[in-house]
């Protein structure tokens, strides 16, 4: 009789290992399925579900980064970047009350840095 939490923790560790080996596509696929399973079994706010969602966000970030730095067209990497933004925004919104405000401030700050970088000679 296998305990679901232990099984989910092991699956998460395996997906993290795949991500570290840059097997991003397989890791993202596994994490997407694992997220559905953990949310259904443990609930949306459970620590394991949150950890899976955070790792999935990282997988999408890595996918966007790898595609962008390898010269892929924006239409290829942009969906991964957008999914990353959505996941981390969801995590921020479902954290403590001040987390969303902190997230919004960080986004504005990073956006300003990007604008300043592009304008520098």
What are these regions (language model features)?
Residues 45, 70-73, 117-121:
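Alpha-helix capping and helix-coil boundary motifs
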Residues 1-4, 46, 50-53, 81:
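Inter-repeat boundary and helix-capping residues of tandem alpha-helical solenoids
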Residues 6-9, 13, 20, 48, ...:
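"A position-specific structural signal for the A-helix of alpha-solenoid helical repeats
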Residues 20, 24-41, 61-106:
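Short coil/linker segments at helix-helix boundaries
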Residues 29-32, 50-54:
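Carboxylate-rich helix-loop segments that flank metal/cofactor sites and access channels
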Residues 2, 15-22, 44:
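Short coil/turn segments at secondary-structure boundaries
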Residues 9-15, 37-43:
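Short, charged, low-complexity loops and linkers
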